[in-house]
Amino acid sequence: MSRTPHAKTPEAAPAEAKAPDPARRSDRSRRAILDAALALVGEVGYNKLTIEAIAARAGVGKQTIYRWWPSKAAVLLDASLALAGDAATADGRAALPDTGDLAADLKQVLRATVDEFNDPAYDAPLRALTAAGATDPELGARFTERLLAPQLALYEDRLRSARAAGDLAGGADLRLMTEMLLGPLTYRWLLRTAPLTHAFADALVDAVLGTA
């Protein structure tokens, strides 16, 4: 008596390999470019920084960079924005601290600003952008709009809260106070007229609030 052969169970088809995610790859390339720009400007300075060097450090082609940015200054601006965003995320900074003690809050933030200005990772790109923005009005406007203006707004918001709480005079000019806090700090950092210290930051707060 012949036996009927058992039908073979069909083998499962091998799982298809997932196709690379273009968006993720683009994000990685973009971040590599920004990191490379920050590293190189600290190593060689802005004048010697080139798109070719950024591309080589990031492991991408020049055209990849030019597809996203028109110039090395534009790359550096976005790199600085990313750096500032990373720092804000790490510190949990969506606003200035509001503990009810205005002087202490402002001193805390200005001391952190002093630390950033004294950190080579921040110093080199910010100096480069400041210099480039002085001769490139469009870049200067973008630098102000995207990096400086949001930071100034945080100070004004904190001062507005203090004014509402009665800690400042009702007619206090919040923009002027903000610039009085940050202007001398930036001047000393940019021109290196004297050491940039926590004591100087504290003195600025005391002077500004003493005249508010």
Predicted regions located by residue number:
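Basic, helix-initiating cap at the start of DNA-binding domains
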Residues: 1-59, 68-74
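Tryptophan-centric aromatic hotspots in well-structured domains and transmembrane helices
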Residues: 68-69, 143, 147, 182, ...
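Amphipathic alpha-helical packing segments from all-alpha helical-bundle domains
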Residues: 104, 115, 119-124, 137-164
